Amino acid sequence: MDLQDNPLIVVSAGIAIVALIFWYVATEIDRRKRNVGTIAIGIVVALCLVAVLPVKEKLKGGIDLVGGSSFIVEIQPGKDEEGNPLPVNEGAIEDAKATLSKRLSKSGLSDNLMQPLGENRLIIEMPGVGPERRDEIRETIQRTARLLLKKVHPNSNQIIAQIEAGTKTLEPGYQVFPIRRTDPETGKVIGMDKILLSRRTIVGGDKVDLARPGDGLGVINVLLSKEGGKRLTNATKTMTIGSDRMAVVLDDEVLIAPTVNATLGRNFIVEGLDGREEVRTVSNALNNPLKYPLNILSERNVTARYGEEVVRQGVTAAIAGLALTLLFVLIYYRFAGFIALIGLSVNMLILFGAMAMFGATFTLPGIAGIILTIGVAVDANVLIYERLREEIAGGKSLINAIRAAYEKAFSAIFDANITTLLTAIILLWRASDQMKGFAITLTIGILSSMFAALLVTRVFFFWGSDTRALKKLSFMNLIPAKTIKFMEMRKPAFMLSSILLIGSLVVMGTKRESSLGIDFLGGSIVNIQLKEGQELSEATVKKAISDLTLEKKPTIQLEQPVGAEGDLISIKYASNDLEKIEKRLRSDIGILGEGQSIVNVQLKEGQELSEATVKKAISDLTLEKNPTIQLEQPVGAEGDLISIKCATNDLEKIEKRLRSDRGILGEINTEKNYDIAFDNETISASLGGEFLKNSFYALGLGLLAVLFYISLRFEFSFAVGAFAALFHDILICIGVVIMCGTELSLIHVGAFLTIAGYSINDTIVVFDRMRESLRSKRGDVAQVMNLAINATLSRTILTSVTTFVAVLVLWIFGGSALKDFSFAIMIGVVVGTYSSIFIAAPVVYIWSKKGSKLRQELIDASLDMPNDLAEPVPSK
């Protein structure tokens, strides 16, 4: 069953799940919690299994992982309402990008990538789209949706007949349009006729507020803007009711031309469309009309941007890393680890099920969101179990210890997840298309993590204790309790961080554009079209240019153009690298070097040169093929011409020898020809200024939301500490990555977003224990903070180590693209762990010393909170 085609089932199940969760939270009776939670888990698991199975059909990868379809479109000059030519202006490319993005999103193709190509072209890449949807997409792209309402000439049929007979010429102010002829019974288009319309337009498509499919077959309901409605009303008032006709023109084709039977307002109906599919496409296009027509120049099937081998390696490495993490949790927490394993499995099932249910695709930034989700999920379980260890060590019974552990861990899990969720939602709202994959997976992942950690695992603990299968719990204890004075280490920590931050800023300042890849700066693209029977792999091309010293790291992609004889190799590179790349490919790859070139030696009057002399001059050269030498006598030339036809790769050797041989007289010129041409074009940055602006804007809004939330839930000094730690982590990570000689690309944007989420999560967990300790313990603030950091130290180390190991496996066994991604995250895990202890907490302490009564403000904040979120304030 495809749940995308059955939204009622999804909505009904969703309402039931939400109701059950509210019931679960509201009830205080453990047995009722257990039963309600079990039903909720059952519905969620069943719904997600239906959504995700069979996996290969339901889960869709992005174009960077699985390939898809690619279109190159060209913007054509448009027409105004009177039919006059409309020149293409500078903003036409951006207008077309925005419009097509909306159209394709409505068609379920939200994860597309669009890049300007030259001055008036666009490359559109769509993930997982095969030949079966190509006709629909072609229509979606090319449909200009130029809607016009025009008055029909009262004697249209008679005048057109006279014009065709040659007895009458076209009247000024009128224009002939094609009109559809439909079958009155089926409504299907069966032919085309002609109709005479006024050149003056009553209302244009720019006045359409909303277009949606109507109730009848081939019908669209259109709602005009207030201005459009006013113009239509004024126009129909001047018409003869019951006699005059008005035509609905779409893209220079008349759909219908009915008689006007009443004065019209903002609403009218468009009829005459050919079935439901055209109704859907046209209504979508009318809501997002193109200012300029688009012409599709080429269509291609494209392979995964990072190559099938890289994707396979990445999936294998990710599974291995996850397996190691789960194995560690299982060994370290024993039976509780087994329950955590169940919770993580449900978490992943919900994530994949929701992605399949809503038709979302997995991109490389999306995988970054999954990695962060796994880290957050493991962290939630570690938080609960470390609390459980404390409660059991304090002498509580098992059932009371479990209850206390979940209650005390709730605030840390809730706050950490909500802050990350705020950032994800704002990214989803404001970020560019390339980052929405990250935001979607992270949003779903955060919600599924909270459900799994706080409900699923607790329900299983209920069943274990109620059935007496769980009588006691034991854990490993590799990290004994410590009393490290972290706050006293703040000065050397600040010095170390200052050195790292200054170093990062210096590296970023000196490297500047040299640290940015083609994704950010743009460059050129060379297309190598192979012929039938010729084979060339991405790996072969990559190997051939691997040792070249290039300005930027090129990306190589294999494509299959529609209608072409053979495959097409597409290489994106820095513009200045073309000569190096072409020379190497021509010399090292046989089929690319094949071709026949000519060396001409033009003699002047009186000069003599024989074929034998030329042959002798080049006889000792090592050539791919024996050249043919021919003496010619061009008409009108002063002297003879020696023509040498040779393999193209031999051209330079022969030319060099002839120029150096003193016995060879005459003027030498060459004609270089290859069997396979290199088609070179300039390409704009895929992560250009608009991308950076949107990303920074979204991140800025996200940070403001997080700071506001932390100020509300904690105190303003905590918000300052969290911001300082996040700024510290991202800046150092960028600096280290650049220092290691890596070019920044889309991959790194996903990695840095993951690091930001990890940093916030890690910091909030430490802050939560500090808040609890400052409310409940007496003594110096620095001393209480030290106790809080020490209390969370085992959790901090365990979470960091498990996350680091999982990403390390990805770095060791993943492909080159995943190595860049995982390396950045490994740096982020180390720096984020360090900053949550040595930067965030000391900043809170220093800020609080500037006059704020930190302990009292936290107590006041807890009294102002809703009862279900506030923790008990200890009596003095």
PLM features: residue spans?
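Juxtamembrane "pre-transmembrane" interface segments
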Residues: D2-D5, R266, E277-L324, E579, ...
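Interfacial segments of transmembrane alpha-helices in multi-pass membrane proteins
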Residues: L3, I21-V36, N221, S225-A247, ...
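Transmembrane helices with small-residue packing motifs
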Residues: V18-R31, G37-N84, A481-E488, P492-Q534
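Small-residue-enriched core segments of transmembrane alpha-helices in multipass membrane transport
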Residues: G37-L49, F338-G359, I370-A377, F438-A453, ...
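Non-transmembrane, solvent-exposed regions of membrane trafficking/translocation machinery
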Residues: E81-T259, F268, S587-D620, G689, ...
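Pore- and gate-forming transmembrane helices of large, multi-pass membrane proteins
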Residues: L100, R305-T325, L341-L344, V376, ...
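Hydrophobic alpha-helical transmembrane segments of membrane transport and translocation systems
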Residues: G353, E390-L500, F813-K876
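Cytosolic juxtamembrane regions of multi-pass inner-membrane proteins
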Residues: G375-A416, F460-A469, T742-L798, Y845-I859
